[in-house]
Amino acid sequence: MKDTETRPGRHRAPEPAHPEQPDTTGDTVVTVSGQDWDTVTETLGGAREERIVVNMGPQHPSTHGVLRLILEIEGETVVEARCGIGYLHTGIEKNLEYRTWMQGVTFVTRMDYLSPFYNETAYCLGVERLLGITEQIPERASIVRVLLMELNRISSHLVCLATGGMELGALTPMLFGFRERELILDVFETITGLRMNHAYIRPGGLAQDLPDDGVAKVRELLDLMPKRLRDMEHLLTQNPIFKARTQDIGYLDLTGCMALGITGPVLRSAGLPHDLRKSQPYCGYETYEFDVPTTTGCDCYGRYLIRVEEMKESLKIVEQCLDRLRPGPVMIEDKKLAWPADLKLGADGLGNSPAHIGRIMGSSMEGLIHHFKLVTEGIRVPAGQVYVAVESPRGELGVHMVSDGGTRPYRVHYRDPSFTNLQAVAAMCEGGMVADVIAAVASIDPVMGGVDR
């Protein structure tokens, strides 16, 4: 309040006869006034009394992990929505700075745990570009990478549709989705030895070749999966309850997607056919025939349709991969960069098979020294930086990788699509109903392991 003003009902104190004038030579005089409390009370008095703040999560079955949603609501209407993240922070990016370039694969595969092959591929493509060996990657290794990534896309979308349907009251798609996903995880286990967190894709190629029954397992899956996907599609696509809960819900048009940096099925549901497999191909994707499905619904139902069509396109790509597979190496030949991947592991799983010992120790002393340094110190990557992106089931998964010329990364940063796409929660949910928040978040399909890292 200024010095010349008086509050109502108060008298101004008499001024002294000779007020002391401040010495302003060399100093700045600042007149500080108090808070305008009248304006504050008027603003608060005009607010609606029934507006409350509700925490949805982080322990909630419909938030896809430990996502916390802070909702300010008036009755059933969401006035403001904010995301609270960080509950699954694991410090993976920092840990990579203390591990060799080869060991990093074991860490990054655990970030977005529903699409581990994409984490591994993006990391390995970055290391290979820094090493300048992108053109030396064996063709068989690139084909197997594409095959595994597309199977992983199907398994990830199955989880999205299964959990999204369950959250809206459709229990049967939940059972069907996880039943079909189990078939894909069985194939992963046959090929890599693990259902999740595989660390199978390595800089320079693959950890080892496909097992003898690997191709047969994939072909059995391809024979069964189209019918299973149709059964699941019939449960949801024309379901009147599912359509009522998803159509015109979670609306986000192309302008909003571009402003927020949204990618993946959310962006393609707004009508833009942006797919890195087409615009910036990697692993030979430019040689495969597939379509990029789009819709113009800009809502949860449109994102559901996109994922259904993407699973069909992934099956087409997997079939092409099987037709292209030819015998050959799955790791570059440079022994200074990678140890043999064509040899089977020993019973202890540590590679101590007679074939390994004969190849490494029985060839030459120089080869033994190189292998010892490769295992203990790791490879040295030339100094530089690179950004590599792949099209994951949730959108653009990018890696910014910096090397100082040593055996460990100087910095590895992941641009996870779940983290970016969660910015759209406010735009999708504000002005809608509380029940529609569940459908909107499910249509984004965030994985908190990738968000928090």
Swiss-Prot record:
Localization per record: Cell membrane
E.C. code: 7.1.1.-
Main location, first listed in the record: membrane
Topology versus the membrane: Peripheral membrane protein
Known catalytic reactions: a quinone + NADH + 5 H(+)(in) = a quinol + NAD(+) + 4 H(+)(out)
PANTHER family documented for this protein: NADH DEHYDROGENASE [UBIQUINONE] IRON-SULFUR PROTEIN 2, MITOCHONDRIAL, NADH-UBIQUINONE OXIDOREDUCTASE 49 KDA SUBUNIT
Similarity-based family: Belongs to the complex I 49 kDa subunit family.
Stated name of the protein: NADH-quinone oxidoreductase subunit D
Species of the source: Nocardia farcinica (strain IFM 10152)
Origin organism lineage: Bacteria, Bacillati, Actinomycetota, Actinomycetes, Mycobacteriales
